[in-house]
Amino acid sequence: MDVIPAIDLLEGRCVRLYQGNYQQSEVYNENPVEVARQWADEGATRLHLVDLDGAKQGHPVNLDTIEAIVRAISIPVQVGGGLRDRQSIAQLIDLGVDRTIVGTVAVENPSLVQELCQAFPSKIAVGIDARNGKVATRGWLETSEVLATELAQQMAELGVSAIIYTDIHRDGTLQGPNREALRELANHIKIPVIASGGVSSLSDVLGLLALEPIGVTGVIIGKALYTGDVSLAEAVHAVGPGRWQDIPPDLGSSAFG
């Protein structure tokens, strides 16, 4: 399972929001490139960037910072936040971004998503941010009547490479992921689901392993890494490649000699 550290960008700095509230932001580091290097050094296999200014304004804003991060590390980088047109996505892919994440546009303009999947195969994922099972849009400022499971099915049919599912009520709260919602979503589609929001401990990460066989292939961790509640290196060791669970027991020795 991929353990994916999140870096939320606001005005060029690494911050965390509480439940998506821009008024409740906490600056963790003035230099996001430094943070990206740290996560790569600790074993991350992918990095998740959110352009918070972009999510609010409807187009990428932190392009210089995103480019600097992509150049500084060798692992794939995925970016979301305000990606609502083809030009914005092409810009990021040209910078070397591995995967772009659309959200609002999936609800408001599904035909554009289909066009994007054809133009940029394997580069388009959809972020489904849900409140009580319904999809939130426009930087979480609005809640639609669209069910998360229905949107996921529609997007899978259009050819997106993955669904990144965030439970807004859990995000930044350290209350643990919503495993029931993740299970329901993964059972409805055949493409990978990446869990996001609420991870507070190593046991939360381990708890998601039970969902791996049905398609939950990764977990995005944000606040818990910055508060120190989760060690990235430990989490990667626990559920990533060569994890504890994959090491066969040593059956060759016996206490009875």
Swiss-Prot record:
It comes from the Bacteria. Gene3D superfamilies: Aldolase class I. It is an enzyme of class 5 (isomerase). The keyword Calcium does not apply. It is found in: Cytoplasm. The keyword Isomerase applies. One of its GO terms (molecular function) is 1-(5-phosphoribosyl)-5-[(5-phosphoribosylamino)methylideneamino]imidazole-4-carboxamide isomerase activity. Belongs to the HisA/HisF family. This is 1-(5-phosphoribosyl)-5-[(5-phosphoribosylamino)methylideneamino] imidazole-4-carboxamide isomerase. The gene is hisA.
